From Swiss-Prot:
Pathway named in the protein's UniProt entry: Lipid metabolism; fatty acid biosynthesis
Enzyme Commission numbers on file: 2.3.1.292
Region (C-terminal hotdog fold): 1130-1267
The species this protein was found in: Mycobacterium bovis (strain ATCC BAA-935 / AF2122/97)
Domain Ketosynthase family 3 (KS3) per the UniProt entry, residue ranges: 101-526
Keyword NADP: yes
The name this protein goes by in its record: Phenolphthiocerol/phthiocerol polyketide synthase subunit A
Function field: Part of the PpsABCDE complex involved in the biosynthesis of the lipid core common to phthiocerols and phenolphthiocerols by successive additions of malonyl-CoA or methylmalonyl-CoA extender units. PpsA can accept as substrate the activated forms of either icosanoyl (C20), docosanoyl (C22) or lignoceroyl (C24) groups from FadD26, or a (4-hydroxyphenyl)-C17 or (4-hydroxyphenyl)-C19 fatty acyl from FadD29. PpsA initiates the biosynthesis and extends its substrate using a malonyl-CoA extender unit. The PpsB and PpsC proteins add the second and third malonyl-CoA extender units.
Length: 1876
């Protein structure tokens, strides 16, 4: 080392500085753990750098060294290490490393075993607690094999089901390992498991996995089964490009090497059960031969198929009792198990050099083979003894020196005695009788984990050696009589045993034998504990915890996990040690947060805040991006001082203390007092001289502190007197000169103390200048920010101005300052300032500086006496300086750090920057903060300054403690399997799902199992009726119950207990049904009968077989006596409409025939008499069960929620009912928010009960399909789109219309145009131009009846001054409906086409356009009701000349369009639904606490929900109007109130209990006088102003167009059109914060029977557009039905029609979610409807996101970029199978698992989307969404286009979404007329 480079840390800093200077990085971008290549060092750069290092270090440095040590940290460590001489000890040790018997250190371990074991510590606790992980096979594990023929099912039933199973083997963190979901699905879960556990093992070892890149690290992985690959390849149609690598055994090791970029050996080892111990042996050999420098040895085993179970069963190897009893007399075989284990190995000398924790030392190992024994799978005693002798010879120790052996110990009749004799013969011989060899086997706890068995035993043994204790061998009670333990000098450890004291290190052996004959044994020894050198273990006073993760969510998860651990198991670990491991022994990740703390309590609180994403002292949350290059140090003026500042820094920050000490002599000389003493003693600075000198001293010391952490200024700016410190830092002045300037300035100003003042005003500069115009002695002293200025002048005038500003409701306050600079009072001081500093000789700054002294920022100041005299007088142009720095021509700066003891300018800085450069990313930080721990505050700000990677913290001495490993974020990944349809099962029996019955004998003495199999088909249901739930057929619960009850009856049981319903059975497609009864348990499961992506078994119900028939009858009688009698005071009620009650809950139909004869209700009891038909082919049990289940769910008629059965504690069957009449008695025993519990008894009149259910529990569903548990209908598209309410919101997108060709079904060749009639406003000119195009004018005497084309030109003016918009709409509706009637009555051989022309409705700017807008809704209904006579509706511009439109109309007449058409500038536009996307334009709604909010229709069910919603958003005052008044409050308690009125009152009271003032007013919103009276009364009472409107009033009156009457139309339009117009006039744009109009999707989709309602809602849509254009936050919300409310009958009709496309109604919760979502966007009209993505040809919906190619050239550049980003995001997210909203546009595709196959698929879809041919390497050349969009933008629109041209064109193949909807709706039956 040279004088300037004294160690590794110095060399690291030198390398960072070199890269910053020569490669062009910023310090924040230089990650010392990234490879030099990743940091931009090319081969040429490496050659130059090697020469620089050779000269610096005085030794030869080769460029090759950069490849062997590829990171800054690794290179610094290598170059700083002493170079060994040939005869040095190091050389001797290096030679020793080549020895084949060098000890190997175990430095890290990881494991995952059943029983909740996820780490070595958990395994130790598990073993010491004598626990066992053995259980029966998980219910779904073998489901793919349960759908075979009966003989297969029988074999499966006879197969042992005992095992040790991991849960959730389908769970994997694919994103973390940068693997796409598609590839992860095809990966053997053993590969996935190994990736996670290996990462955990490396973290346990304290080795950041990222540091192993390109290193000679070997991977040796034991595995012996590839069942997943076999399953995945069984169906060739499912095999893809991932299948081979996903299922290959070799990839198990290679996958880890690939992900970590390891260059050592990568070997998959398969020697069956000895695989993992052989892997350890091979890893040790590879380390000793220097094939690798670090080795990862592993074993993994998963049991996915029953085939191997079956094979071992056949030879009697598996324990029928489900226990591994190694060495016990009752041993009857082993139990198979799952798990994974990983160990990290190093040569011992390397581990000691690196300060690693050495958990144990491998002294030797050996591997042999049985050769030819008594059979391939039979053990060979001689071979076992040979491997033991070889291992101990290799270890260099006597066999008698080993204390304990972890035996193979499977618990088999043959294997245990053979192994015991081999151990005793080799290792037991010569031992004293009282010191036997101790043996045990982990298989007694975990089962035989096969390929992972050796490493399981190895990890257990390492833990035992560490802890000095040996866990007990489970299930050892009586020694195996075939093993002479005493003679062999061996003992089985049957209790927790202390390690015997032997006088030598603890030593143990581990054995593992493969069933093919490969034997392995490893010898280990206790490792030596590493202790830090004396004096090196001092803990820092403040610690920084760096919590890293690939995403912000992962950072949060890690922080929460660490907090839990520090409060629990890690409570004794020192905070500094936690920081040590976290900061230096974890991999760097793209995102990180930091926590700075002095103690554990602060650290835990900070971690909790970081986990929650909250702000807290010391916490810096992950940055969303880098602010860009360039750092500015900003030096504030006076005011940041506080007593105690810097005291902690002096104690805890050496760089700060050194800076103060270096400054101290000159400071004392200039200031006359000690800066050190003031800071150390926490003294207060008093007087202008002390304050100004103390602050500059503080600023100079803080500057050195920042620089010591690598944060250097690129530019400096000083504010007022802060410019002195800035000049010193820039190099223009020395510290002594700076202190002299400050001392002179403060001394001259001191006599003026108290003679003037300054004030901070919340005003911009022009406003301030206007304010002080009348005060000539007051000046604008400081331009602080666009919103802040500071004035200076006489105190009295300053106070007067403060009063004036506060009167404007603006902030104004005096500045606490002794002397006010920057005003004319300074003029008298300037000469003295020039004189006293005349000899000042400043230098040229070495760092850029912007002076705030001059208005012209381009002034290059000379920091001499003249400058400082001017500085104290001139205004401070701080705002201008900051704006210039943030957007300068020489390059913008993005990080601004205020160097002061308290932040005064940070907010002003950020305000200025955001005003100057909106949308740019900047960071504005302080340094310290008043009255806080200044070390914690500084470190926190330091961390905020590092956004790319955290600041480097000193590396404490080793060892480091282990802390919890990375928390995974698992998602499910599994293959799909497919079986041929109809291969299994017969049709089910009538009334049940039971099919063919098979009895299956079991291996043990247990009773036989029973299996019923059937095939359920939609066209062959076992019940006569239907049971449709939201348009999907669901097998009723009664049939499911009847099924398992019938099976129980066949087995001699008449009762069931513990019935649990898990999933519904959807009967919309064929399904295979299995009922299995085994050992008093019964269950029903199903699987799709045909191969589909969801082809897996689903369990629907489980129960316990219970009680004998006699017991059951007794129970029934007792239960009937208790609950079967109706209460004495019961009264008979009217029989409710059962079908209506069910329909309200989304259920259509009954599966069985039964009717209600009487209904008697009292309190919680209900008795219902039911009648059954005389002929019941399926018997009476099914109908009775069906009645009981349905009626119990309806026991509270007033509760309209949907209830589904969840469980039954007991259900019993009695005698079969023979009569037609039975009674169902219901007793509701519990009723809460989650559901109800009911006891049910069914009996014929006066007879013994035939059915009893105790504690029938229903759960309430808020969402019809309960998609969290059940599959939605297949036609609904992706579940996410079906369930995420934010996906329900659409806008209307107007796109150029597709012109159909002559062969199009909707096109008609017009060779002989027929007569045309023009009706309505100004049709003469239009008629003339049509005549010129060949159309004949109709004879008007009978024109309409004879015309081929009828064109109605909408009137644009009212009939008179008093005609309101409602009157106008009624009049025009009457005219048009009469016209439709006339045309509809024409003969079929005289077709006609009706067209309507409107003007300006699209924009709705003019009143005449708004008035016509209702016609849009009416037009859609006419098209739906009368498609045979509908032509279309065309909207012209408001000023279009009808005569000029004639030729275009002539072309359109022959092309009927169900869509509304808009013609602008010669282009015809058609509507399409478009999802709402992009960034929100406003924050979520928050009501003002001092305002009131009006809801019309507010007393209805919908209005009251909206009132509650507003209350949730802070509304304190609500005005609810309705046409029906509420009774006086004194009558609110009366029992005579009806249910509906009671519901309204209860809702209002609930609001009032929340603190909301509710004013319920009876008013007709359509009546202008009523509304004016309401507002006038509020004004008189001084009520709070109304700041928001929700117009929810409305009624429906269903009529077909041909039946509509004027009165009916008026009734519907009055509240909608009339009410909205009254509200619009009463609350003009700008008077309210929001104006919401509750409309209906009927106005969009054209629902038969809804002409007037659709028309009224279209008016609301237009009014919203009109107000929005006037700057008012107005939105029309076009809803479908709200479930349970029936917003209107029309909305239900919309839902019924949309259900054919997979849509549905929505819950209130979903409605409000959608509302809140769309409210953030600048949208006038929102269509809220669940719309599935359109399915592809195969029904998969894979192409749902594709859009026709656009005409990019006519779009603005910003729009092109936005469209491309959104479209590409959809395409790529779909292919990568990640949620679109989680696809970061800046994240490289490679991190998401992109590969060439996926790239080709994305390329194809992108070509269709963009419309141009794309390169195959496109995604790799442009690896993020953002960069790809930028590239494509240049391809498709190379020239910037005006922002005004926003029209996008569709290709000729494009179709309108609405066209499709109308096509579906037009088939509505003509009898759609109905009443509400």
């Amino acid at each position: 080392m040279t004088g300037s480079i004294s160690g590794e840390a110095d060399l690291r800093h030198w390398l960072i500085d070199y890269l910053v200077t020569n490669i062009g990085c910023t310090p924040d971008e230089v990650d010392p753990d990234l490879s030099l290549a990743d940091l931009g060092v090319s081969s040429r750069d490496a050659v130059v750098l090697s020469g620089e290092l050779s000269e610096l270090l005085g030794r030869t440095v080769s460029p090759i060294d950069f490849w062997e040590h590829p990171t800054i940290n690794a290179l610094a460590a290598y170059l700083a290490a002493p170079e060994p001489s040939p005869d040095s000890d190091a050389a001797v040790k290096r030679g020793a490393r080549n020895s084949l018997d060098e000890p190997i250190a175990v430095v890290g371990m990881g494991c995952r075993f059943p029983g909740g074991i996820s780490c070595p510590e958990a395994l130790w606790d598990f073993l010491c607690e004598r626990r066992s992980s053995i259980s029966q096979v998980p219910p779904q594990r073998w489901q793919p094999f349960e759908g075979g023929p009966p003989e297969v099912a029988a074999a499966l039933a006879r197969t042992t089901r005992w095992g040790s199973f991991l849960p959730d083997i389908d769970a994997f963190d694919a994103e973390f390992f940068e693997i796409s979901p598609s590839e992860a699905d095809k990966m053997d879960p053993q590969q996935r498991l190994l990736l996670e556990v290996a990462w955990e093992a490396l973290e346990h070892a304290g080795i950041p996995p990222g540091t192993l890149r390109r290193s000679a690290t070997g991977v040796f992985a034991g595995a012996c089964l590839s069942e997943y690959g076999a399953m995945a390849s069984a169906d060739l149609s499912q095999v893809d490009g991932w299948s081979n690598s996903g299922g290959a055994m070799s990839i198990i090791a290679n996958r880890l090497s690939y992900f970590l970029d390891l260059r050592g050996p990568s070997v998959a080892v398969d020697t069956a059960c000895s695989s993992s111990l052989v892997a350890i042996h091979l890893a040790c050999q590879s380390l000793r031969t220097q094939d690798c420098h670090l080795a990862i040895a592993a074993g993994v085993n998963l049991l996915l198929s029953p085939a191997v179970f079956r094979g071992f069963d056949q030879v009697g190897a598996l324990s029928p009792t489900g226990q591994c009893r190694a060495f016990d007399a009752t041993a009857d075989g082993f139990v198979r198990g799952e798990g994974a284990g990983v160990v990290v190995l190093k040569r011992l000398t390397d581990a000691q050099r690196d300060g690693d924790r050495v958990l144990a030392v491998i002294c030797g190992s050996a591997v042999t083979q049985d050769g030819r024994s008594n059979g391939l799978m039979a053990p060979n005693p001689a071979a076992q003894m040979a491997v033991l002798r070889a291992a101990y010879t290799n270890a260099g120790m006597q066999p008698s020196e080993v204390d304990y052996v972890e035996a193979h110990g499977t618990g088999t009749l043959l294997g245990d005695p053979i192994e015991a004799r081999a151990l005793g013969t080799v290792l037991g011989r010569g031992r004293p009788e009282d010191s036997p060899l101790l043996i045990g086997s982990v298989k007694t706890n975990l089962g035989h984990t096969e390929a992972a068995a050796g490493i399981a035993g190895f990890i257990k043994t390492v833990l035992a050696v560490q802890h000095g204790q040996i866990p007990p061998n489970q299930h050892f009670e009586t020694a195996n009589p075939h093993i002479p333990f005493t003679d062999l000098r061996m003992k089985v450890v049957d209790t927790q045993t202390e390690w015997p004291a032997t006088g030598h290190p603890r030593r143990a052996g581990v054995s593992s034998f493969g069933f093919g004959g490969t034997n392995a044994h490893v010898v280990i020894e206790q490792g030596q504990e590493v202790r830090p050198a004396p004096g090196q273990g001092l803990s820092p006073a403040v610690s920084t915890l760096v919590v890293a993760g690939k995403t912000m969510q992962r950072v949060s998860a890690t922080a929460g996990m660490l907090a839990d651990w520090m409060e629990g198991p890690g409570a004794d670990v020192a905070l500094a040690d936690v920081a040590h491991t976290l900061n230096h022994h974890r991999s760097r990740q793209p995102k990180f947060g930091t926590v700075v703390a002095r103690d554990r309590t602060q650290a835990i609180a900070g971690l909790r805040a970081l986990a929650a994403g909250q702000h807290a002292p010391g916490v810096v949350n992950p940055a969303e991006g880098s602010p860009g290059p360039g750092t500015v140090f900003v030096y504030s003026g006076r005011g940041s001082q506080w007593a105690g500042m810097g005291r902690q820094l002096l104690a805890d920050e050496p760089a700060f203390a050194a800076a103060v000490a270096e400054l101290e002599p000159v400071f004392v000389e200039q200031a006359g007092f000690s800066l050190h003493d003031v800071l150390a003693n926490g003294e207060e600075l008093v007087g202008i001289e002390q304050i100004q000198l103390g602050l500059i001293g503080m600023q100079l010391a803080l500057t050195e502190l920042w620089c010591s952490y690598g944060v250097q200024p690129d530019l400096v700016i000083g504010h007022s007197m802060g410019e002195v410190a800035a000049a010193v830092v820039a190099g223009a002045l020395t510290p002594a000169e700076g202190l002299r300037v400050t001392a002179t300035r403060s001394r001259l100003m001191a006599p003026l103390s108290g003679q003037g003042g300054m004030a901070l005003l919340e005003l911009d500069a022009p406003t301030t200048e206007a304010l002080i115009a009348d005060f000539p002695q007051v000046t604008l002293g400081i331009y602080n920010s666009p919103r802040q200025t500071v004035i200076a002048g006489p105190t009295e005038q300053i106070d007067e101005l403060i009063t004036r500003v506060r009167a404007r409701d603006r902030f104004a306050s005096r500045v606490n300052i002794e002397v006010a600079p920057h005003n004319p009072a300074m003029d008298a001081l300037q000469p003295a300032m020039r004189s006293e500093l005349a000899d000042l000789t400043p230098r040229t700054p070495t760092i850029g500086i912007i002076s705030t002294t001059y208005a012209d920022l381009h002034t290059q100041p000379v920091f001499d006496a003249e400058h400082w005299a001017t500085n104290m007088r001139n205004p401070v142009h701080f705002q201008q300086a900051i704006a210039s720095a943030g957007s300068g021509a020489d390059g913008a700066y993005h990080t601004f750090i205020e160097i002061s003891a308290h932040p005064l300018l940070t907010q002003a800085i950020i305000d200025t920057l955001h005003s100057a450069q909106p949308g740019a990313r900047y960071t504005s930080l302080g340094t310290l903060q008043r009255d806080t721990d200044d070390v914690v505050t500084f470190r926190t700000n330091l961390n905020k300054a590092h956004t790319i990677h955290p600041p480097h913290t000193p590396h404490p001495p080793e060892p480091h403690p282990p802390i919890p490993t990375t928390p995974w974020q698992h998602t499910r990944h599994w293959i799909t399997t497919k079986y041929p349809a109809g291969s299994v099962g017969s049709a089910p029996r009538a009334g049940t799902l039971l099919g063919q019955h098979t009895t299956v004998a079991t291996v043990s003495a247990s009773p036989p199992s029973h299996l019923w199999q059937a095939r359920l088909a939609p066209d062959a249901k076992p019940y006569q009726g239907g049971h449709r739930f939201h348009q999907v057929e669901v097998v009723p619960a009664s049939v499911v119950l009847h099924t398992i009850l019938s099976a129980a009856t066949e087995l001699g049981y008449s009762a069931l207990s513990e019935v649990r319903f898990e999933q519904p059975i959807f009967a919309d497609r064929p399904r295979l049904i299995q009922v299995v009864a085994d050992n008093r348990a019964i269950s029903l499961a199903s699987s799709p009968a045909a191969g589909t992506p969801s082809d897996r078994w689903t369990r629907h119900v489980t129960a316990q077989l219970s009680s004998s028939p006699s017991d059951s009858a007794s129970s029934l009688n007792e239960h009937h006596r208790a609950n079967g009698q109706p209460p004495e005071r019961a009264h008979r009620d009217l029989i409710p409409d059962l079908a209506e009650l069910l329909a309200m809950r989304g259920i259509d139909g009954l599966p069985f025939s039964w009717t209600v004869a009487s209904w008697t209700q009292h309190s919680s009891n209900l008795t219902v008499a039911i009648d059954l038909p005389e002929a019941l082919p399926e018997g009476s049990t099914g109908p009775l069960l069906d009645a009981a289940v349905h009626l119990a769910a309806l026991s509270d008629v007033a509760d309209s929620r949907l209830y589904v059965p969840a469980s039954i504690e007991q259900i019993s069957l009695g005698d079969v009912v023979t009569g037609p009449r039975s009674s169902v008695t219901l007793n509701r025993t519990a009723h809460d928010d989650d559901g109800i519990t009911v006891d049910v008894t069914v009996a014929a009149h006066g007879e013994v009960p035939s059915l009893s259910m105790r504690s029938l529990r229903y759960r309430a569903l808020d969402f019809g399909l309960d998609v969290g548990r059940a599959q939605p209908p297949a036609s609904t598209g992706p579940v996410e789109a079906y369930c995420d309410a934010t996906n329900f919101v659409h806008t209307i997108d107007w796109q150029p219309q597709t012109v159909p060709d002559a062969t199009h079904p909707g096109a008609e060749q017009v060779t002989h145009p027929g007569p045309v009639a023009i009706i309505g406003d100004d049709g003469a000119a239009l008629c003339e131009t049509l005549e010129g195009a060949g159309y004949q004018p109709a004879v008007m005497s009978d024109g309409v009846s004879q015309a081929r084309y009828v064109v109605y030109v909408a009137d644009s003016d009212p009939a008179g001054a008093d005609e309101t918009d409602v009157d106008f709409a009624v009049r025009i509706c009457t005219e048009i409906t009469g016209l439709v009637r006339t045309l509809a009555e024409r003969d079929a051989d005289k077709p006609a086409a009706l067209w309507i022309l409107t003007r300006g409705v699209h924009e709705s700017v003019a009143p005449s356009a708004l008035r016509q807008s209702f016609l849009w809704g009416l037009a859609g209904v006419i098209a739906a009701e009368h498609p045979e006579l509908w032509g279309g509706l065309v909207d012209l511009a408001i000023n279009d000349d009808l005569g000029e439109f004639g030729p275009a109309l002539a072309e359109l007449l022959a092309k009927p369009s169900k869509s509304i058409l808009v013609r602008r500038d010669g282009v015809v536009l058609a509507p399409a639904l478009a999802p709402v996307r992009g960034e929100p334009a406003r924050k979520s709604l928050q009501c003002r606490p001092d305002a009131a909010y009006l809801i019309t229709g507010g007393l209805g069910a919908l209005g009251l929900l909206m009132a509650d919603w507003l209350a949730d958003r802070g509304a304190h005052r609500l005005v609810l109007t309705g046409r029906t008044p509420l009774p006086p409050r004194r009558d609110w308690q009366l029992d005579t109130l009806d249910t509906e009125l009671r519901r309204r009152i209860d809702a209002i009271r609930a609001l009032e209990m929340r603190g909301v003032t509710v004013e319920a007013v009876a008013a007709d919103v359509g009546c202008r006088e009523d509304v004016q009276a309401l507002l006038a009364a509020r004004d008189r009472d001084g009520a709070a102003p109304i700041r928001g409107i929700i117009h929810a009033a409305g009624i429906t009156n269903d009529q077909l167009v041909t039946s509509m009457t004027g009165d009916a139309v008026r009734q519907v339009m009055w509240p909608k059109i009339g009410g909205s117009q009254v509200l619009h006039d009463a609350f003009p744009p700008g008077s309210v914060d929001f104006f919401y109009l509750t409309a209906s999707a009927a106005g969009i989709f054209g629902i038969p029977g809804q002409g007037s309602y659709a028309a009224a809602n279209s008016y609301l849509d237009a009014l919203a557009r009109a107000r929005r254009q006037q700057g008012c936050h107005t939105m029309s919300l076009d809803w479908v039905a709200w479930r349970g409310l029936g917003l209107a009958a029309d909305a239900q009709l919309v839902s019924e029609e949309l259900a054919r496309m997979g849509s549905r109604d929505i819950t209130p919760s979903e409605a409000f979610t959608a509302w809140e979502f769309v409210d953030g966007y600048d949208v006038a009209q929102a269509v809220v409807v669940p719309m599935p993505a359109p399915a592809g040809a195969d029904g998969s919906g894979a192409n749902a996101y594709l859009l026709p190619a656009r005409n990019w050239s006519v779009m603005a550049a910003t729009e092109v970029r936005s469209e491309l980003e959104q479209g590409l995001r959809r395409i790529i997210a779909a292919e990568l199978r990640v949620p679109e909203k989680e696809l970061d546009t800046d994240r490289p595709f490679a991190e998401l698992g992109l590969n060439s196959l996926m790239a080709m698929a994305i390329r194809r879809e992108a070509e269709q989307f963009v419309g141009i041919e794309l390169s195959a390497t496109m995604l790799f050349n442009h690896p993020t969404v953002k960069s790809l969009a930028s590239y494509l933008a240049k391809r498709v629109a190379p020239h910037d286009v005006s922002q005004d041209n926003q029209i996008s064109a569709l290709s000729s193949s494009a179709g309108s979404v609405l066209d499709s909807l109308f096509d579906r709706i037009e088939s509505a039956p003509p009898e759609a007329e109905r009443s509400v």
